[in-house]
Structures are given as C-alpha cells and as structure tokens.
A protein has these predicted regions:
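Short, compositionally biased
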Residues: 25-245, 319, 344-346, 350-357
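Short, solvent-exposed loop/turn segments at the edges of extracellular beta-sandwich modules
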Residues: 13-18, 116-117
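C-terminal, surface-exposed recognition/capping segments
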Residues: 148-150, 222-357
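Short, isolated positions in well-ordered beta-strands
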Residues: 20, 143, 291-293
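Extracellular/luminal regions of secreted and cell-surface proteins that mediate adhesion/ECM remodeling
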Residues: 5, 21-22
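Extracellular recognition modules
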Residues: 7-13, 110-112
Length: 357
C-alpha cells in the first residue's frame, strides 16, 4: 500500500445497534504533496539561502489562487560561478504547488506556471542568496541591506551587488549587466550571462509597443515601451504598486517597494567620485550602521543599460500626479534627488523595505 492510500473499515448499523451488513474495506487515496521546504508567504519572489528542495503555493499576493495552471518550468537563470552546475532544476507543478531544487550556487531565476498550451499564466522570481539583513534609516523605515536580486551587500560595485531592474508596476525582473549598452543594444550582457529555457520559446527583447498588464504577465522577458517612450502600458495605471503591497509588487514576502516618503532619508547619502566625477560608490550611514548603494545605472526607453556611475531606484509613488510618471531616487555625483521623475517604462533598481502594514 502506498503512503498516500488509506483503508476505511465500514459497516452499516441499524437504530437498535444491530449490524445490517458486513464490514467492508474501502480504499481511498489522497494526492501526496510535493517534497521540500515550504517557502511560505504570498509573494512574487522568494529568497532561498541553502541548497535543497523547496516549494511554494501558486497564489497571488492577496492569497487568491492562480487558475489554468497545467505545469511549471524554469524560464531563465543566471549562470553563476559554475555554468555547468545550474542554479535551479527539477521544477514541477502539483496540486497548487510548485517545487524545485537549488544547487547552492547563488544567483537569480524565474519560474513560470504554464497552461495546457505552454503559455505563461504567472511567474515567480527565485532569489538565491545569503539571508539579507536589514537596517533602520533615520525616518524609522527599515530597509533591506541590498538591491532586489543582488547576491551581496558588500562594499564596491560588481555584478554580485548590482541587483535586477524593473519597469514600474511590473512584478518580473530584467537582468542587469556590467557596462553601458548604448553601442551594443539592449540585453547584450543578459544574453551571455543568463541561460534561457529553449522549451518555452522566450528571449530577452525590446518591443516598441504599449501593452496591458495581462500581456506583460504572458511575456515577462519582453521590455515593452509605448509610443511616447514613457510608459510600458498602453493605458496608464498608477495602482499597480502602492504603499499597500499589491499583487504586482516584486519584493519577497514581508517586504514591499517603498513609497517616496519612506525613502526620503536617503537624501543623506554620501559618494566617492573618480577623476571624471563619476561615482565609484554611494553609502548611507545612520546610528553607526552603514549600507552601500552600487552605482549601477538604469535601463532607458530602449531597454539599454545606461548612466553607469549613478543610482536609480523606484518608489511606489506617482510623481506629482503626472500621468505615466512615477517617483524615483536619482543619485549622481554629489547630487541626490529623492523626488526624481521617471517614465514607468524605464528600468530601475529596487531597495525593498520591511512591510509593517
């Protein structure tokens, strides 16, 4: 008998307690759950810090079930320090859960849930890194010690602490890079430093077209941009991110994208410049603690990595009620604008905060 089968011994009994039929064995079954550590929480990204088997429930942030899932597979993954040893494998869907195995190599991956036609119905970011620490800033907001997607919080600017890029309001990350791409075109580094699952017929690409949220979910690797080079949405929607965590918030469980008010303490950020007045690094200190901000740049309206030497971070806030614009923090040289304007189609880093709401 399998571990998921149960035997029920049943007999019919009359009102006076007499048996009216013989007892019978009735065998039933209950579908076994997937093995592995349950990552818990409802989120669009999950932190994994040790090798092993893991699983999570296929729900949105609000707890609602995601329908039409038939299977799951990995979509893309970073190559890590050893490209012959994939960072994630054995992705499987069963009974409202997705399971996978992590090799222990740090990096990032996206897992996609698929319908019967192999179309993506939802996807999740798997962030393989040591457990991020937190730090309280001057205004009382508690921040993560690294950019979303970074595998290091150490001082310096290198690909381990750079993090991933996000178009405002989208839950899925875009791989970064290590140098400007205005000559090579968008995603030149992403194409060499990530492995893409050939079974899912996806690739890193830029598309000059405004779309709706449903299309962005189906094509998480497509960097869309509308006709005005401002928003990736055909019709703007300022509610996709908020100071209450939404279904499209990309931060892990227990964290969310900060509002413009919550991130204002960073105006005290400091910088070290090189001989060309480009920032070598930025840092913020409060109450004898210091955290670092790599000068990584951003992705522009063509999806290209530009402005290396600056820090560009999204907030969840709309920018002064301007359509299709949101507030982003811009650190460039000794200049810091905590109310910088950013078209929602551009790609910027995120520094998640502890979600106390």
């Amino acid at each position: 008998m399998s571990s998921s089968e149960y035997v029920i011994i049943a007999a019919a009994v009359s009102a006076d307690g007499l048996y009216t039929s013989d007892a019978k064995n009735i065998t039933t079954s209950q579908e076994a759950k997937l093995p592995g550590t349950n990552l818990g929480g409802n989120a669009n990204s999950y932190i994994v810090s040790e090798k092993g088997q893991y699983k999570f429930e296929t729900t949105k942030v609000n707890g609602s079930e995601i329908s039409d899932i038939n299977s799951a597979d990995w979509l893309w993954m970073t190559k890590g320090n050893n490209s012959s040893n994939p960072i994630i494998s054995d992705v499987v869907y069963k009974s409202g859960e997705i399971g996978f195995t992590v090799s222990g190599v740090e990096g990032n991956s996206v897992i996609a849930a698929l319908d019967t036609k192999n179309n993506i119905v939802w996807s999740w970011h798997i962030w393989i890194t040591d457990v991020p620490q937190t730090m309280e800033y001057e205004n009382g907001t508690v921040f993560m010690d690294r950019m979303l997607g970074a595998t290091s919080a150490d001082r310096g600017s290198n690909k381990e602490n750079y993090g991933l890029f996000y178009q405002w309001g989208r839950k899925d990350p875009f791989y970064g890079g290590t140098k400007d791409e205005y000559k090579t075109g968008a995603f030149a580094t992403a194409n060499t430093e990530t492995t893409i699952n050939p079974a899912l017929n996806m690739k890193w690409r830029y598309t000059k077209k405004g779309v709706d949220i449903e299309t962005s979910i189906k094509e998480p690797m497509n960097y869309f941009m509308g006709d005005k080079n401002i928003d990736w949405l055909a019709n703007e929607d300022p509610s996709l991110w908020n100071n209450i965590k939404t279904d499209y918030d990309p931060c892990p469980a227990g964290y969310r994208v900060p509002s413009a008010t919550e991130i204002e303490s960073i105006k005290q950020i400091e910088a070290e410049l090189d001989e060309n007045d480009y920032a070598k690094e930025f840092w913020y200190t409060w109450n004898n603690e210091t955290t670092y901000y790599p000068s990584y740049g951003c992705r522009d309206e063509k999806g290209e990595l530009v402005m290396e030497g600056g820090v560009f971070m999204w907030t969840s806030s709309q920018h002064l009620n301007q359509s299709s614009y949101s507030t982003r923090v811009v650190c460039w040289g000794f200049f810091t604008d905590i109310n910088g304007i950013g078209g929602r189609g551009t790609g910027n880093n995120i520094r998640c905060i502890v979600d106390c709401k």
